[in-house]
């Protein structure tokens, strides 16, 4: 938008912390506002003005005291930021005489003063900024328009611009902040004078609010405009994310909350900005706070954003086409719930936008309802009234309500109606599967708590950080015994399991290191055993009060086989994975979702434990970790999972025709008959070293007790 201002207000801010290119990066508060007005018509400047601001925490850095000359005592009697902003606006309106129709725009040295200082602090303190703070001129960009071949924009500063325009200001006559403002004024006067005759017509814009919208999977998203935010409170919405990045322009529909495999928020979000410049400013807010939590900010890619926010469903696009609507997610609906029942659930205090058209039920590809739905509300007030019905009853079920986003709608619909967001490893073809990769059972002692669990690690923590954290106990870690746990997006989950040389050292490490700090976060440390690691990775909880089994595990599955193996050396564990147990050793972890019938007879599937888990994905071992494939020391007895062999084998099937015969009491008889192993509940598959030895027991079709057996060569 083209403007023609009558006045420019050269504004300079000072915080209690860093200055220059680091201004605002440390989240410090404003302590000083200095400005000077320039009449663009007469090319004359007014007086230099100053307002001191009282921060909530008066603690000036040495850099601030040295440059500004301020002291803690000088800030004690002054007004806070909200009053200072109001005074600044009133004094500007009076000096410019806006009542007579005159207009003015702010002008700053770069983007930081407005985008990284004023707007973030005003947002965190719930201060409503005047309209003049949402449009401003960047003096560096205005200079670059006239001299495009000069220094790169990121290398520009006031001194470079002043030298090029032959502008000199006597620094001895002014304090530092007043000197900077005077320098800006002289640069502006030089730009608008001959021979340059520059016009200030295209100001920078600061978005007043975040706009929701949809994103197509076919859309092109620049990698240099996307960031990933971690550590978000689980109840945060896209509006909360926009508030955290206040001052920076987020693209329409550019805040996408990430969900885990169960459809719940995992504390991460992908944010798309309008330009690379705003993305770079967002990265400077790394470890800034949202409430009491600090948020980590990292670079991401356009592909990452499209995986989360992109959609192709026309139904979803139509539902989300109503802009500026508040979305509420319903979870736990009865499967036979109708739109009319949902409308009655919310009426009359919170009417749904467009009636039944404002309700979107989530369904499986075959049309079955999932129990989820999304509902539109026209304003924040209606949405808040709706959220008050959280856990109210609809039929015989209580309904969970959450504030949602357009990106979450896309993710949930993508999850249920199309391919999963996280690809599942293919079904096993055992003829090409490598031998088991776990450490032999002789390395693990059942029930011994010789492992340590770390919880609450910083997401960027490395193995070296963990060794430093454990201190003297780092020497007691087994070789390649540090195992980082990843979430379903392949990102660090903040947990790790460590194999110690003895239970005593694991106990001492847990006692001495519990709740020590690592990178500003305290870390919880618990001693545990390999069996307890199984439970935790399957969704159970482990703390100093004891172990709680996961709700997804059936009671008979709590019993672990004798000598359960420990973690593979150097393995990287996905959250939700299950450590291999004796009779399930050859199965990939995603195959342990439940018992399955024997597949095609050309492959061999031994009986498996009834193991249940929510979801898991594969992750490679970290670089440098030795491979343990085919590692079986001399004298090791193969487990049930090690039946795969490079030697040729033959199989026979034993099918009992006498219902009274039960194999749970007949294992020894079968072993004595065929010298085999691994019986099942009704059928048994037995492997032999050669075809000849497999044919011998077929001649005898009975076993002790008189039961007739059908022996077949496979």
From Swiss-Prot:
Stored PANTHER family: HETEROGENEOUS NUCLEAR RIBONUCLEOPROTEIN-RELATED (PTHR13976)
Domain (RRM) ranges: 225-302, 326-406, 450-530
Top-rank taxon: Eukaryota
Keyword flag Nucleus: yes
Name of the protein described by the UniProt record: Epithelial splicing regulatory protein 1
Role played: mRNA splicing factor that regulates the formation of epithelial cell-specific isoforms. Specifically regulates the expression of FGFR2-IIIb, an epithelial cell-specific isoform of fgfr2. Acts by directly binding specific sequences in mRNAs. Binds the GU-rich sequence motifs in the ISE/ISS-3, a cis-element regulatory region present in the mRNA of fgfr2.
Cross-referenced Pfam families: RRM_1
A single MF term (Gene Ontology): mRNA binding
Keyword check for RNA-binding: yes
Family under the similarity heading: Belongs to the ESRP family.
Alphabetical UniProt keywords: mRNA processing, mRNA splicing, Nucleus, Repeat, RNA-binding
Any single GO BP term: cranial skeletal system development
Subcellular location: Nucleus
Organism expressing this protein natively: Danio rerio (Zebrafish)
GO CC entries: nucleoplasm; nucleus; ribonucleoprotein complex
Higher taxonomy: Eukaryota, Metazoa, Chordata, Craniata, Vertebrata
